[in-house]
Amino acid sequence: MNIKRITAVALLALTGVLSAAPLKIGWAINDISTDKPVELAGTFHWRHSKGLRDPLMATALAIDNGEDCVVFLSMDFISPPTFVANRVRKRVKREIPDLPPEKIIFHATHIHTGVSIGRTEKKLADEYGNYMVEQIFKSVKQAWESRQPGQIAYGYDLVVTAFNRRIVYFHDRKGGIGMSPRGKAVLHGRSDVPDFSHVEGGADPFANYLFTYDMDGKLTGAIINVGYTAQVSISDRYVSSDTWHDMRKLMAEHHPGVFILPQVAAAGEATFEQPYYKAAEKRRYRLIYGREPAYPGEFQRKQIAGRILTSFDRAHSWAQKEKFSDLPIKHVVRTLKLDPSVPSKVDYEAAKDGLKKIAELRKNPKTTERMRTSLNGRGNVCKRVVKSYENADKLPRVPMEFHVLRIGDVAFVSERFEYYFEFGQRIQARSPFIQTFTIQLAASNGPGGYLATERASANGGYGTRFLCPVSPKGGQEIVEAAVKELKALKAMDKPAKK
C-alpha cells in the first residue's frame, strides 16, 4: 500500500489544492509482432499477411509524483482491443499493487498493417492474443518498476504530417454499399474533375511534445503527439508499424537510446495522401530517390518520418531550456455516456437496399474475391443501421472510457473514436492549460468507429453516419466534458477559500 499516495489524496480532498512533488519517470518498449499468416486489419476486404516487414511495438511511459500517476501505453495496432486492456489491468491489479490499473491509458497508432484478431483463424488468433497481452503487460511492468527521479519539458512545433481526405463536390455523389451514405463528400475522392468544390476541413499542423530527462538533464524519451494515423502502407500484405518504424530508425541514428511514444491527436478525417498536387509529388519522389519504391508507401513513410524528426529537434532546441522536476499531477478517469447516432429514414432505406445488393453480389459468379471478402463487413454495417433505426427510441447512450490528465501546465484528454479534427480544436482552444494533447483511439470499453462533426455528417460519405456509433451531439458532449474537467483541474492551482 502506498501510504504517501493515500495521504496526498486525502490532503487534496480536504484542501482542493494540488501541490508539486518530485517526478519519477520510467520507460519500456517490447515487440508485439508476429510473422505468422494472420489477417491484416484496416480494410473491408481481407488481406492475408505474407510475413513481417518491420516490428510492431508496445511502448510504455510511467510518470508518477507520489500523489497521482499515469502510464501511457502506445501500441502499433488499429485500435486498442478491449480484451487486451481488460486482461492487462487484471494482471496489474494482481501483480503491481501500487499502480492503480485504471490509470493506464491504452492507445493505438491506427496502423492498417497490424493483426486483425477477429479475422484470423481462432487458434492462431488466441496464440497471438496471449502473446500480445504478455508483451504489453511486460511494457507496463518494466516502465513502472524502472521509475527514477526525472524531469520533463514540453513544447510544440508546426509540421505537415497529414491532409484532410474528404473531398466535397457541388452535387451529391452516390454512396457505397454498407460504407458511404449518399452526400456531397467522398473520402479520397478525385479533385481533378469539374464538380470538385473543396476539401472539407483542415488538418492539425501542431506537433505536441513532452520530453523526459534524467536528473542530470540527459534526454531519455518523448511523447510525440501528432494528428496523423500511420497507414501509408495500407495496400501492403506484410505486418508493419508503418511510419513509426521509420521514425524509430531515425531516432536510433540521431538520438541513440531515446524512447519515443507515439500518440494520435484528433484526426478522424486525416490521411497521408495529398488531395491534389499528386503529379508534383510523384515528380518530387522521382528526383529525390531516383527509383521505384521497394514496398507500398516507402517514400511517403520516409518523408513524413523525416519531417517529424526535424520538428522534434526544432521543438527540443528551445523546450529543453525549461525543465521541471517537481510538478502536480492529477489524473481523472470517468465513463462518459454519449448521445448515440440515430440513422435517418434515407440512411435506413439505403442500408436495406445495401443488404439486397450484398445478397445479389454473393450469388453473382463475377463478383471479385476482393469484393466478396468485404461483404461480411459491409453487411454488418447495414444491419446495424437497420437495427438502430428500427429501435431508435430504445438506443442506449454509448459508454466511453475518458481520461483527463494534468502534469503541471500540460494536459491530456483521451477518447476512443476516430475523432474529427474540429472536435480536437474545440477542446484545445478552450483549455486553460498552456498545451493540451488530445489522444484518439484511446479506451478499452468498446469498439471505436468514426465520430464526425455536424458538417461532415451533413456532407455524407465514408467516415460519417453509417460508421459513427455516436452522433455529432455526442462528439460535442466529449468537448464539454473535457473543458469542464480541464477547468476544474486548473482551478486546483488556487488556494481553497476559507
Question: Residue ranges of each PLM-predicted region?
Answer:
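Bacterial N-terminal signal peptides
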Residues: 7-17
